[in-house]
Amino acid sequence: FEKVQHKLPMLSLANAFNQNDLEEFIDRIKKYLNLDHREIIKFICEPKIDGLSINLNYENGILISASTRGDGKIGENVTSNVGNIIGIPKRLQGQSYPKQIEIRGEIFLNKKDFIKLNKKIDKKNKFSNPRNAAAGSLRQLNSNITKQRPLKFIAHGIGKCSKEYSTISNFFNDLHK
């Protein structure tokens, strides 16, 4: 696959396993933003979908490229393999989308589809988990194989965008118009 440099880095998520981890994370955010330790920060929380991170680049509402996260700075161009994935529109709906926007999210397989897929594959080629199945399916050189896999997409944020949003909530609200 052709290498693609991201316009803005695609950072990976860190885990918080307990209350202390979460409090340390909040302290780091406040320090980074030069906020008083008493300042209250609002968060949007969402379930962690364990899939393959993807960056979808739209211009004038039309999908022009899709790339994997890779090392966060450079990913792989997988545009030819995302066309039939549930949840990835080739054209954005409505009128409120920005002229240029990168939508970021996860390509994944749900557990039920993962089990079905592994039943169809011979024993030596079975996938060890749904995340590996999603990654292996997306990175097929033969896009017909990718089309046959029940991959799904869920958006969780934006990269480079021609319109500024003060919060991610404002972005999601704007997209629903």
Predicted regions and their residues:
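RNA/tRNA-interacting regions in translation and RNA-turnover enzymes
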Residues: F1-K177
